[in-house]
From Swiss-Prot:
One of its GO terms (cellular component) is cytosol. This is Transcription antitermination protein NusB. Coiled coil: none annotated. Keywords: RNA-binding, Transcription, Transcription antitermination, Transcription regulation. One of its GO terms (biological process) is DNA-templated transcription termination. GO terms for molecular function: RNA binding. Transmembrane segments: none annotated. Involved in transcription antitermination. Required for transcription of ribosomal RNA (rRNA) genes. Binds specifically to the boxA antiterminator sequence of the ribosomal RNA (rrn) operons. Belongs to the NusB family. The keyword Aminoacyl-tRNA synthetase does not apply. Pfam families: NusB.
Length: 211
C-alpha cells in the first residue's frame, strides 16, 4: 500500500462502511469502527467470490459460444459480446480482490491514527443525515438516470464526494480526484470515468449557482 494521508484512508473506510451501517448511525463511535470495517471485509470477500464465480460462468459461456457458433456474423458478434462481458466481470473481480488484500494494513493504520476514525465517522454521519440533499445534488447531475439505479459502490463514492464538497468545504477538484481514485480501486472498468463526469457536472452546477 502506498503512503496515504489520514483523510484518504478515512475516505476509504467510510466507503466500505456505508453498506454496513447500524440501524441508528448517530450512535456510531470510534470504538465501533473496527468492528464495522471487519464486517465490511467479510461482506467484500463474499462479493469478490460471487464476482469471480460470475466471471468464470461468463468466460465459460463465451468459450462455449466461440466453439459452437457458426461462421455467421451474428453468432460471432454474439460470442464477441459475451467475451467482452466476461472480461469486464473478471476485471471488476480483480479490482475488488486487489483492494481486499490490503484490509489488514488499512485497519492497522486506522487504529494508529485517531484522525482517520474521526473523519470516517463524520463522513458516514453527514451522508446519513443529509442523504436527501446529497442525492438531490447527484440526481441533478445525472443524465437520464436515477441515483437509486446506480451500483451501490458508485452511489456511495458520489455521496462521499458531494458531501465533502457541500459540508466539508473541500475544493471541488480535490473531491473529484479523490473520488476517481476510489472508483479505480472499487468500481468497474469504466466506473472512474462515469464518476468523474457526474462530479464535474456537480461542480459546474455549484459554480453556476455561486455566480
Amino acid at each position: 500500500m502506498q503512503d496515504r494521508k489520514p483523510q484518504q484512508i478515512a475516505r476509504e473506510l467510510a466507503l466500505l462502511s456505508l453498506s454496513q451501517l447500524p440501524l441508528n448511525p448517530k450512535k456510531l463511535t470510534e470504538e465501533h469502527l473496527p468492528k464495522l470495517v471487519l464486517a465490511t471485509v467479510r461482506t467484500l470477500r463474499a462479493e469478490v467470490q460471487d464476482t469471480l464465480d460470475n466471471a468464470a460462468a461468463e468466460l465459460q459461456r463465451s468459450n462455449d459460444r466461440l466453439l459452437t457458433s457458426q461462421t455467421r456474423a451474428s453468432d460471432l458478434n454474439t460470442a464477441r459480446n459475451m467475451l467482452q462481458e466476461a472480461i469486464s466481470y473478471t476485471q471488476t473481480a480483480i479490482n475488488q480482490l486487489g483492494a481486499s488484500v490490503e484490509f489488514p494494513e488499512l485497519i492497522q493504520l486506522a487504529n494508529q491514527d485517531k484522525e482517520v476514525g474521526r473523519y470516517a465517522i463524520k463522513l458516514v454521519k453527514i451522508i446519513n443525515e443529509e442523504r436527501s440533499v446529497i442525492d438531490e445534488q447527484i440526481t441533478s447531475a445525472l443524465v437520464d438516470w436515477q441515483v437509486t439505479r446506480l451500483a451501490q459502490i458508485d452511489r456511495d463514492i458520489l455521496r462521499i464526494a458531494v458531501a465533502e464538497m457541500m459540508f466539508f468545504n473541500l475544493p471541488n477538484s480535490v473531491a473529484i480526484n479523490e473520488a476517481v481514485e476510489l472508483a479505480k480501486r472499487y468500481s468497474g472498468d469504466e466506473g472512474h470515468r462515469f464518476i468523474n463526469g457526474v462530479l464535474r457536472r456537480v461542480s459546474d452546477q455549484k459554480k453556476a449557482l455561486s455566480v
